[in-house]
From Swiss-Prot:
<dbReference type="InterPro" id="IPR001199">
    <property type="entry name" value="Cyt_B5-like_heme/steroid-bd"/>
</dbReference>
<keyword id="KW-0560">Oxidoreductase</keyword>
<dbReference type="InterPro" id="IPR018506">
    <property type="entry name" value="Cyt_B5_heme-BS"/>
</dbReference>
<dbReference type="GO" id="GO:0005758">
    <property type="term" value="C:mitochondrial intermembrane space"/>
</dbReference>
<dbReference type="GO" id="GO:0006790">
    <property type="term" value="P:sulfur compound metabolic process"/>
</dbReference>
<feature type="binding site">
    <location>
        <begin position="378"/>
        <end position="380"/>
    </location>
    <ligand>
        <name>Mo-molybdopterin</name>
    </ligand>
</feature>
<feature type="binding site">
    <location>
        <position position="146"/>
    </location>
    <ligand>
        <name>heme b</name>
    </ligand>
</feature>
<feature type="binding site">
    <location>
        <position position="323"/>
    </location>
    <ligand>
        <name>Mo-molybdopterin</name>
    </ligand>
</feature>
<feature type="transit peptide" description="Mitochondrion">
    <location>
        <begin position="1"/>
        <end position="80"/>
    </location>
</feature>
<keyword id="KW-0500">Molybdenum</keyword>
<feature type="region of interest" description="Homodimerization">
    <location>
        <begin position="403"/>
        <end position="539"/>
    </location>
</feature>
<dbReference type="InterPro" id="IPR036400">
    <property type="entry name" value="Cyt_B5-like_heme/steroid_sf"/>
</dbReference>
<feature type="binding site">
    <location>
        <position position="367"/>
    </location>
    <ligand>
        <name>Mo-molybdopterin</name>
    </ligand>
</feature>
<keyword id="KW-0809">Transit peptide</keyword>
<feature type="binding site">
    <location>
        <position position="362"/>
    </location>
    <ligand>
        <name>Mo-molybdopterin</name>
    </ligand>
</feature>
<dbReference type="InterPro" id="IPR014756">
    <property type="entry name" value="Ig_E-set"/>
</dbReference>
<feature type="binding site" description="axial binding residue">
    <location>
        <position position="144"/>
    </location>
    <ligand>
        <name>heme b</name>
    </ligand>
</feature>
Length: 546
């Protein structure tokens, strides 16, 4: 029994403790028949008259050793695991790079000073939470609440809040998305909060016009619930002109203009770039694009009433939405004044979409529609319009929606040197059949869309079913559009013959516009860290059965 007790105490110990621990050395001396301190097995048999006394002595020593070692192990673990405690005031005082940037999440405290400049959303976004809790901002930007983000944050943990300070967050983390509208269940959701979703490819090209309920949705912030009766659009007047405060009824008094326009997110098909190398952004597939018939007042008419005229200097029309984050920062963007004042550019302050008032997800009651330009400039829930000497200072204009070389990473990127995306390049994609589908031999119907920015018309779509060895020209469907005003996509279709012995098809599409711009054949040469402008040949692989 004594031998078992000895082993149960000693064998479980780390080697360093077995040799160096003072309690252990004393035990070995007490149990051993020699004076050596080497950890050899002691004799636990007794033949003299004092054997009972010696037995109890050894047992007591071993039990005492167990208590001492358990306490020693507890002290070691406690010294390693006991976090340092901080008060909310400690955290609050670390709210800038000079004092250090601390934040809290639950009861944990983090020093993120070294991460501020590395934050993918820009230092200014992270600094909003400096000296306080992350919860209100994670509730708003739910993409942060992911295991890999928490793992990254854990590297910066320095301690915990005092128990009395961690009972409740200093700011109520209420749900800013509680009043978001109900969405169509067919939409493929890329982000729930803020809501971002795309229609499934099989529905996307069912018709030339995308139905409102399945029009792709790109939100950056919670959807505001605006009263059309109290809504006002503020238009800053030109020097010598008059600023305007326009109700929805006032906008209806301007000449109504209608135009069919395709909107495409800069991140459409980003998921294909992610397969080459990790990028920052939502994993859009081929559905971050849709087409609608928009109606409203021409922006040039409204600006003219406020006294603005086209001038020689480089000026920009800045838009500000009524959606905002907890600090009151609204979504914003801008376009060149030359485009805004050109009647042929057909820029709208739209209040109708496919003959109906704008849905809430798409900007009710008023949004900007800029034909031929990236969706990021089509500001929704429009609240303010101004003409400035520089483009918008919004984060989404200055620090986002820009393209870079494949060699640029987050350590070398300089957003100030890259121009903001306005017109998008030629684009096409296959919507039918889908990747991995099974088709029958004989004849297969291949369908998709094609579009180019800046009003450039799609003049041809080439399709291959053998991985690019041979090509066939697809039939283009949709409205005929004026030269340089081809604001909407073309739906295309090809019926291809499939030999009975064919086991698979490697289908590719590529489009050409009226400037003879063509799509690049692969993704790697156009990869960029934001995953925007993804317009390589689109490819799907399908299986063929007899």
């Amino acid at each position: 029994m004594l031998l078992q007790l000895y082993r149960s105490v000693v064998v479980r110990l780390p080697q360093a403790i077995r040799v160096k621990s003072t309690p252990l050395r004393l035990c070995i001396q007490a149990c051993s028949t020699n004076d050596s301190l080497e950890p050899q097995h002691p004799s636990l048999t007794f033949s003299d008259d004092n054997s009972r006394t010696r037995r109890w002595k050894v047992m007591g020593t071993l039990l005492g050793l167990g208590v001492v070692l358990v306490y020693h192990e507890h002290r070691c673990r406690a010294s390693q695991e006991s976090p340092r405690m901080y008060s909310k005031e400690d955290v609050r005082s670390h709210n800038n790079p000079k004092t250090g940037v601390w934040v809290t999440l639950g009861s944990e405290v983090f020093d993120v000073t070294k991460f501020v400049d590395l934050h993918p959303g820009g230092p200014s976004k992270l600094m909003l939470a400096a000296g306080g809790p992350l919860e209100p901002f994670w509730a708003l930007y739910a993409v942060h609440n992911q295991p890999h983000v928490r793992e990254l944050l854990a590297e910066y943990k320095i301690g915990e809040l005092n128990p009395e300070d961690s009972m409740s967050p200093s700011v109520e983390a209420s749900d800013p998305y509680a009043d978001d509208p109900i969405r169509h269940p067919a939409l493929r959701i890329n982000s729930q909060r803020p809501f971002n979703a795309e229609p499934p490819p099989e529905l996307l090209t069912e018709g030339y016009i995308t139905p409102n309920p399945i029009f792709f949705t790109r939100n950056h912030l919670p959807v505001p619930n605006l009263d059309p009766h109290t809504y006002r659009l503020h238009v800053v007047g030109a020097p010598g002109g008059q600023s305007l405060s326009l109700s929805l009824d006032d906008l209806h008094k301007f000449p109504k203009h209608e135009v069919t326009v395709t909107l495409q997110c800069a991140g459409n098909r980003r998921s294909e770039m992610s397969k080459v190398k990790e990028v920052k952004g939502l994993e859009w597939r081929t559905g971050a694009i849709s087409t609608a018939r928009w109606a409203g007042a021409r922006l040039c008419d409204v600006l003219a009433q406020a006294g603005h005229r086209l001038c020689d200097s480089e000026a920009h029309v800045c838009f500000e939405g009524l959606d905002s984050d907890p600090t009151g920062t609204a979504y914003g963007a801008s376009i060149p004044l030359a485009r805004a004042m050109d009647p042929e550019a057909e820029v709208l302050l739209a209040y109708e979409m496919n003959g109906q008032p704008l849905p809430r997800d798409h900007g009710f009651p008023v949004r900007v529609v800029v034909p031929g330009v990236v969706g990021a400039r089509h500001v929704k829930w429009l609240g303010r319009v101004s003409v400035e000497s520089e483009e918008s200072y919004s984060h989404w204009q200055r620090r986002d929606y820009k393209g870079f070389s494949p060699s640029v990473d987050w350590d070398t990127v300089n957003f100030d040197l890259a121009p903001s995306i306005q017109e998008l390049p030629i684009q096409s994609a296959i919507t039918q059949p889908q990747d991995g589908a099974i088709v029958e031999s004989g004849e297969v119907t291949i369908k998709g869309y094609a579009w180019s920015g800046g009003g450039r018309a799609v003049i041809r779509v080439d399709v291959s079913v053998d991985g690019g060895l041979t090509w066939q020209e697809a039939e283009l469907e949709g409205e005929e559009q004026c030269p340089r005003k081809a604001w909407a996509w073309r739906i295309w279709q090809l019926k291809a013959q499939v030999p009975a012995e064919q086991k698979e098809l490697n289908i590719i599409c590529k489009a050409v516009d009226d400037s003879y711009n063509v799509q690049p054949d692969t993704v790697a040469p156009i990869w960029n860290l934001r995953g925007v402008l993804s317009n390589a040949w689109h490819r799907v692989h399908v299986q063929v059965v007899p």
